[in-house]
C-alpha cells in the first residue's frame, strides 16, 4: 500500500503524495491541495467573467419595458403610481444608455439622475430595494447621514462607490454600469441659505463632494471603504454611466412650497385664487426651487433633473400594505410561525387596530412592522417551545400585547 502511495503524483503539478498535505483521487487522475485551491480561483474568475459578459451582452429585446418594471413594483409596493412611473422610465432609459452604440451623429444620451421627495414611511427605500430584485446591474444603497467631508469623522464620499464595487464583486466594468440609491439626501442640506463662517462638514461640503460623482468623472475609490491613506491601492471608477437615485423626507418643505404658492399649508382660509390647491398634500406642487430653499445647492439640483414625490399613505393604503404585497407583513409572520409548525392568522379588526395606531402616532408604513413585531413578541418567544400549534391574533390580543412606550422608544 505504501508503494502505491509513493507512485501517486498530482496530475497537474507532478508533486508526489509524500510532498503534499492532501491528495484527492479521481477516476484516472489525482490533484493536490495546492492545485485544487488554484483551480478554485480559476473557476471563480471564469464565472465572474461570464457574469460580466452576460451583463455586457444585454440585448434591447431582453430589456424590461417601463410598464413591466412598474408591474413588478406593483406586486411589492402599494400605491405611489407617479413615483413608480418615473422610476420605471429612468431605469429603462439607463439600460438603453448602456446599450447605446457609438454613432456618427454625435448624439449622446445623458443620464437622468432622480430625486424622490416624500414623508417617512411612504416607501422610498422599499421602491429602491424592490427594483434591485429585477435588475441585471449592480445596485447599492447608501445612507447620506454618515457622509462627511474628507478629513472629518465619518465616511468619505468615495465610500459610496466602494459599496457599488462590493455589489459588483469588484468587477469595475460592471460597477460602472450600476445604480446607486442615496437615502436621506435631505440630511446633507446646508443649514441656511446664507453661507456660514463655521464649517458645515456634513452639509454643503458633502454636496460639493457629490458633484463629481453625479456629473460623471473618474474617481479613485478605496477598495475596502474607510478613509484613504497614502499606501492604500485605489481603484479608478468612471461614474459617467452610473445612475444615481436620491431620496429624502425633506421635513418642513411644505412651508417652502406654500410660500412660493402664496398660500397656507393647512388649517387657514386661503384666497379665492388658491382654492384649487390641495393644501393637505403640498408635495405634489414641489419644484426644484423649493429644494434650493430647503438647502440643496443649485449644482446638485441641476444634476438631479428628474424630481418626483411620494404621496402620504392614507388609511386604505396602509391597510392594503398589511396583506396585499408578495412580502406583506402578515405573510411574513405566517411563514415564520409555519417554520415551527404553528398556524397563525390575523383577524380583520386586528389589522384595523394596527393601522389606526400607525396613523395615531404618525409612524407611516414602516411603523406597521414595528407595531406587529411588538404584538407578536411574546408568541414568538414562547410558542416554539410549547404544545399549542394555532394562534388567532385578534384586536383583543393586539391590545393586550402592544406596549406603546416601547414602540415609541424604538422609532
UniProtKB/Swiss-Prot annotation:
Pfam families hit by this protein: AAA_2, ClpB_D2-small, zf-C4_ClpX
KW ATP-binding (keyword) present: yes
Record carries keyword Ribonucleoprotein: no
Binding site for ATP: 119-126
NCBIfam families linked: clpX, PRK05342.1
Record HAMAP family: ClpX
Self-association state and partner proteins as the record states: Component of the ClpX-ClpP complex. Forms a hexameric ring that, in the presence of ATP, binds to fourteen ClpP subunits assembled into a disk-like structure with a central cavity, resembling the structure of eukaryotic proteasomes.
Protein name: ATP-dependent Clp protease ATP-binding subunit ClpX
Organism: Porphyromonas gingivalis (strain ATCC BAA-308 / W83)
Gene behind this protein: clpX
